[in-house]
């Protein structure tokens, strides 16, 4: 029974005793027992007076004996892991807390650079999914979970809620660990007390996995714990895929750490083993069994800070950072998708002016931007410069040039010329890939026939105009 319940029961007992005493006193007065009392009533009267007196000061200041705190198995080992119990409603969870000075580096960057990148977002004025403009560093909760399974659903339990956050001159890692399934209410109570101090989650696939898992488990106990905060959410996985899908073998966090962040893990427990270790822990209750999971999660939430710093620097300062041409192209494509044509044009030009193999892809994209702006002449000039390069020219360059010549400039001959070149490029590519579609071939042939017909019609019209002109001249001379 909880301490609160015991106090309520004691209060009820005291009220009953007081009522009983008052009733007895009334009966004695009504019977005319005044002045000298018979001996048999003397003792009862003394007891009554004692019962009706207010509680003495010593009684009021000495609360009932506290409930014994739950015994923590292997408490000394938890202490070595920098973890301590959090007790709520007779249940406990473990909270591990590790602090780092803000100037410490994790991989390529110091944690303190988070201040700089937030200021950069503020100064840029750009509307971007990863923007932290208007936020303080402590508003960002770099969050990750560990669960009993890698799929979703109510049967999947979140047993570790981990995050890192800047607090003053330190980066604090906190991990809320579930030592037994029946303590889930206490787990979320402990987490929500801390999480509500921030406004935005920063995760790696958190929109699709981590936070939906938290919401699902929270729904089952929502009447016993506070509501989940209405967090903003910056999911870095989506940005990582935009930037590095074509460049890296995988966009897993571990690969990105090595290739982009200079973070190299030693003796790291693979994430897929976390559920196995947790079930082993439930059997033994020995924290040494789960230590590898805690260390893995700690590195995850620290790497999220480093990754956010790195991605922000690429997005806002790619012209002066050590950015690959592939990254520069993908950054430009991201800005184009967001409707920021000026930023997209800047990125594409950096690639177009290089001798990189993606140069013609960048020129094609620049032409598309000019076309969107209805600057058709500039678009055609960019595409024609692309055709003159010695590197591979995508067939789409010829297709786009043909469309502009046909629909904007009504130059049938030029449109036909570029369409035939596109068809030849398509046949070469299809031969290499063994993937030539009959539908594609038919589409090319129809376009060529249509342009040839337009060309013949244009020539006939021109011949008719010339013939008419000569007839008119002859008529004038005969007058």
Located regions from the model:
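Structural motif corresponding to the intra-repeat A-B loop/turn of tetratricopeptide repeats
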Residues: 338, 373, 408-409, 455
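Conserved RNase H-like, two-metal-ion catalytic cores of nucleic-acid enzymes
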Residues: 128-200
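Residue at a conserved register position within TPR or TPR-like alpha-solenoid repeats
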Residues: 335, 363, 370, 405-406, ...
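N-terminal accessory regions of nucleic-acid-interacting proteins
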Residues: 1-137
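Acidic, Mg2+-coordinating catalytic module of metal-dependent nucleases/exonucleases
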Residues: 248, 253-321
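Structural register within alpha-helical repeat arrays
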Residues: 331, 365-366, 400-401, 415, ...
């Amino acid at each position: 029974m909880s301490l609160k319940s015991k106090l309520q029961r004691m209060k009820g007992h005291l009220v009953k005793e007081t009522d009983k005493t008052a009733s007895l006193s009334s009966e004695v007065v009504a019977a005319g027992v005044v002045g000298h009392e018979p001996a048999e009533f003397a003792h009862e009267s003394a007891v009554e007076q004692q019962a009706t007196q207010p509680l003495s000061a010593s009684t009021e200041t000495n609360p009932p004996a506290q409930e014994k705190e739950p015994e923590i198995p292997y408490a000394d080992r938890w202490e070595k892991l920098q973890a301590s119990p959090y007790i709520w409603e007779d249940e406990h969870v473990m909270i591990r807390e590790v602090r780092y000075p803000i100037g410490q580096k994790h991989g390529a960057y110091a944690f303190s650079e988070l201040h700089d990148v937030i200021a950069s977002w503020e100064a840029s004025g750009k509307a971007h999914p990863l923007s932290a403009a208007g936020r303080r560093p402590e508003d960002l909760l770099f969050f990750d979970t560990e669960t009993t399974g890698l799929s979703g659903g109510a049967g999947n339990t979140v047993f570790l809620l981990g995050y890192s956050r800047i607090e003053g001159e330190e980066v604090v890692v906190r991990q809320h660990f579930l030592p037994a399934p029946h303590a889930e209410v206490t787990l979320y109570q402990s987490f929500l007390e801390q999480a509500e101090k921030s406004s935005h989650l920063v995760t790696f696939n958190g929109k699709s996995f981590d936070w939906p898992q938290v919401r699902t488990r929270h729904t089952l106990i929502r009447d016993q714990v506070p509501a989940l905060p209405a967090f903003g959410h910056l999911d870095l996985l989506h940005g990582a895929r935009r930037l590095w899908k074509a460049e890296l073998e995988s966009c897993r966090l571990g690969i990105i750490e090595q290739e982009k962040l200079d973070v190299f893990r030693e003796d790291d427990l693979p994430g897929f083993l976390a559920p196995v270790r947790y079930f082993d822990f439930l059997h033994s209750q020995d924290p040494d069994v789960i230590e590898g999971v805690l260390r893995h999660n700690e590195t995850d939430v620290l790497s999220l800070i480093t990754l956010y710093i790195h991605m922000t620097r690429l997005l806002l300062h790619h012209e002066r950072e050590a950015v690959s041409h592939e990254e520069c192209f993908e950054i430009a494509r991201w800005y184009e998708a967001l409707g920021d044509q000026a930023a997209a044009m800047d990125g594409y030009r950096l690639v177009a002016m290089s001798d990189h193999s993606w140069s013609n892809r960048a020129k094609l994209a620049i032409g598309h931007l000019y076309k969107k702006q209805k600057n058709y002449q500039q678009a055609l000039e960019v595409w024609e410069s692309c055709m003159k390069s010695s590197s591979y020219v995508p067939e789409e360059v010829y297709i786009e040039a043909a469309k502009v010549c046909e629909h904007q400039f009504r130059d049938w001959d030029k449109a036909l010329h570029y369409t035939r070149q596109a068809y030849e490029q398509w046949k070469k590519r299809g031969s290499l890939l063994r993937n030539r579609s009959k539908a594609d071939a038919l589409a090319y042939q129809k376009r060529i026939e249509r342009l040839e017909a337009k060309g013949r019609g244009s020539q006939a019209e021109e011949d008719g105009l010339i013939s008419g002109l000569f007839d008119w001249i002859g008529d004038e001379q005969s007058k």
